[in-house]
Amino acid sequence: MNYFREMHKVKLFIEKLADYHHPDVFNPWADYDPDYDVASARSIRRKQLARYLIHRIENARILLIAEACGYQGGRFTGIAMTCERMILNEHPYVNSQMVLGCQGKRTSRRDSPFIPRETQRTRGFNEPTDTVVWNAALSAGLGPNDFLLWNIFPFHPHKEDHALSKRTPTESELQDGLFFTEELLKLTGPLPVYAIGRKSEQTLTGAGYQVTGLRHPANGGATLFREGLRDSLIQTGLYNG
């Protein structure tokens, strides 16, 4: 791999991401909220996504695509299905070396009076779904660079006037997000795609992609997600658990 050429492509991709704006949507690589973000948040999140992608665009064996960026995960790290505690070495299964190959940085403010929980302020945000996905992939024998995590809508959709909330992306937003997934696939080349949740699966299949649908881990779906991923990897010969 020509590192500098590939990094240039990655940075161009991130610039495209940063150009996206939509009402009630937070763009981790372009937007800044002084109530929650440190001053250099946008730059940190861009650099962390670039590091994450450069380790995987030629090494990933599968692509796992969920629905949208969550406020406890990628909203603050810039990386899909990856929370701050993972890149701060505050997580029981995942550490910064596995995600980035180096020490990560938080972008949430330790001193923010708007972040409600003390553990979130002192240790960073934690997202249960992120833990399930990472743990399932690692337990199946995949290395950290063997799977690339993404969201069909890569930004954080939130309720009006409620920054730390979540909502389902609209159909229009999902179609907007599909463009960025297709741009990502130009970087990686063809990969087996696993769609996490119905919105991701329907958007991808509607665009003509062949995907393996997996139950979303949220709302009691963690076991079905783990079993579905394991069984599919066994069938394709990628399981090494």
Feature locations, PLM:
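Short, flexible loop segments at boundaries between secondary-structure elements
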Residues: 208-240
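Alpha-helix/helix-capping structural signal
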Residues: 198-199
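A polyanion-binding, active-site-adjacent surface
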Residues: 2-192, 202-207
